[in-house]
A protein has these predicted regions:
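Bacterial N-terminal signal peptides
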Residues: 8-18
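Intrinsically disordered, low-complexity regulatory segments in ankyrin-centric signaling systems
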Residues: 23-56, 65-68, 84, 88, ...
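Ankyrin repeat boundary/linker residues
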Residues: 31, 64, 97, 130-131, ...
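Start-of-repeat signature of ankyrin repeats
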Residues: 34, 67, 100, 133-134, ...
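Ankyrin repeat A-helix N-terminal signature
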Residues: 40-45, 73-79, 106-112, 140-146, ...
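Ankyrin repeat structural motif
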Residues: 46-54, 79-87, 112-121, 146-154, ...
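Ankyrin-repeat inter-repeat connecting loop/turn
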Residues: 60, 93, 126-127, 160, ...
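Leucine-rich solenoid repeat scaffolds
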Residues: 199-230
């Protein structure tokens, strides 16, 4: 298959399927209703019950039907106090759920900076390879234009040049899955300033500069050219 056709197929696939928010599976109403024990306590942010249950022998990393731990549930429901308590009691801050998401990526996709900081402070790693796309929280955040999340992950040592299984870096995703607006520009700018490689091309051989020019993203083009992009 010619490279241009391959590239077009990959782009169509990514635009349809590579949405981290869509790929993630938060608990639905029926699951919340069925939760007991630590999952239920995490969902309602009940740190007191969490501590009591764990001290009475509950498995702190017990899984639900989608392999979510109570900590995953706390992250999805933005229950910061529950997440803090779970990690303090030994919950695995880097556990992956059934869709291969950790709490760092869950918080990043939700643009939940407080939960992200809680996750990182509790031992979550910005270096984890997550999602069905073999990506990172940084790639997901750049794709979605979550600029403060991007800056937080960079400060936490996220890999700047990781390439996911679509052939894209965080820098590329900020362009090809972005809208060229203020927040996506801020993501790209933060990545460039942090030292991301501005010349890693996609699978078709198109560089970030080429991709930005194709889309008419003039601010991104200017940032890339100033950084020596080709």
């Amino acid at each position: 298959m010619p490279k241009p056709i391959v590239a077009a197929c990959l782009t169509a696939l990514a635009l349809t399927l590579s949405l981290p928010a869509a790929a993630q599976t938060p608990p639905d109403a029926s699951e919340f209703a069925a939760y007991t024990g630590l999952h239920a306590a995490a969902a309602r942010g009940d740190a007191v019950s969490i501590e009591r249950l764990v001290k009475n022998g509950a498995d702190i990393d017990v899984r639900d039907g989608n392999r979510r731990t109570p900590l995953h549930v706390a992250a999805f429901t933005k229950q910061d106090a529950a997440a803090v308590k779970l990690m303090a009691l030994g919950a695995d801050a880097n556990a992956l759920d059934g869709q291969r998401y950790d709490i760092v990526t869950i918080a990043s996709v939700a643009d939940d900076v407080p939960m992200l900081r809680t996750a990182l402070k509790g031992g979550g790693k910005a270096t984890n390879i997550t999602s069905p796309y073999d990506g990172t929280a940084l790639i997901a955040a750049a794709h979605l234009g979550h600029d403060e999340v991007v800056r937080t992950l960079i400060a936490a040592g996220a890999p700047l040049d990781h390439v996911n299984n679509l052939g894209w870096t965080a820098l590329i995703e900020s362009i090809v899955l972005g809208d060229g607006g203020k927040r996506h520009v801020a993501c790209l700018d933060a990545l460039v300033k942090a030292g991301a490689n501005v010349n890693i091309a996609d699978r078709s051989g198109a560089t970030p500069l080429t991709l930005a020019k194709r889309r008419g993203y003039t601010e991104m083009v200017a940032i890339l050219e100033k950084a020596g992009a080709r």
